[in-house]
């Protein structure tokens, strides 16, 4: 592989040039089979053929597919990757949803996008009956394409057309559909190609051969993982899929991985392995890419001093993951999220909010022009909601969030307003706020002292209706009204 990676012109170029011409014999994707022992390898040649099968299948199933939304509702699997390319190259709009959300959340998102088809893995994540009742005729298995002959590909994707929808948590209690185009993707690929070149020229350990392999435990419906699906074909790298954290060490042992995209919680686990002398169970893993929440700089420095490379990233779904990268292993910059890349404009406004402008910025929020106008100003600057400072060397340091979205160490985003609305349904609660405390979701509740047990029971019931990562794990009671500002708004600090 050449040190200079040629960024593809689009999704069509990614398949026809990168997969079929440049790296047909490279391993594209690995995963552990259902027996828990066998490693399945799919080369780029096979991958491209399956993408062609998916394109042919979708065009037959949805003859007027141009612009139609096709939903993926599945755990991490090879077929998810095939479908992602296939939907786009068939002319559809790719929609990735979190299969572990409650039915209330999924019902809202599905109702908003009005899917033509839903490709799903058939697993009951808690709302299978509701899904079948509402969308039964539109459900298809993830491997629906397997008996279809490979079809012809055409470059049918307009560079500025709506290419995909990915939902992101919002502070209003409702998720928002982020509209992304091929132009957004290609802008992001410029950054990730430079990341790959940086690894090649500066980071490759002695004796390590190319191409590299990347382990991912993050869900494919999340942008931090999805960018790997789109950014590795130009480099001919392999993506090792792990779908369950309980299988992490098993899969890592079976599939050698050089690099891993990780939530902070898993970086801490690897750090503990290092401290306990259990590095061998990592099977040669040496580079960790981390985003979503801050990491202890002392921990990062110690990892670096013991042969690991930890790259911190700052990006958003709204920018196709493009953003700020930190490659330094220097102690004074360990707490920085890094420096902005050269392909995008960045600034800190008068409040210290990070603003981004460039081809990576989304088209807007789906069917929500008001929310779009709130974050993209008349000059095209996207206001991220994150506050930061910049040092004399150009490194950015996140100092807080302009809004109240809670980012847990697991990388999950939680809207406090959503939980507060649920708690407000309890007659015994006078007022409440939900906040993060010691990496836990904590509810501070003002209620009569003799109603506290009733409130605890209500919180338990609310938790039963929520995904694990959203559950309230700490409750603090106060017999005094919660503090408010001069405008009467509750103070969260």
Predicted regions and their residues:
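N-lobe entry segment of adenylate-forming
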Residues: 1-61, 66, 85, 111
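Conserved pre-ATP/AMP-binding loop-to-beta segment of ANL
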Residues: 24-27, 150-167, 173-174, 203-213
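Conserved AMP-binding A3 loop
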Residues: 41-45, 163-190
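Conserved AMP-binding/adenylate-forming
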Residues: 55-101
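Conserved AMP-binding/adenylation subdomain of ANL enzymes
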Residues: 186-213, 220-284
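Gly/Ser/Thr-rich phosphate-binding loop
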Residues: 252, 258-262, 270-332, 345
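Conserved ATP/PPi-binding loop(s) of AMP-dependent carboxylate-activating enzymes
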Residues: 339-342, 349-375, 395, 412-414
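AMP-binding/adenylate-forming catalytic core of the ANL superfamily
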Residues: 358, 363-364, 387-470
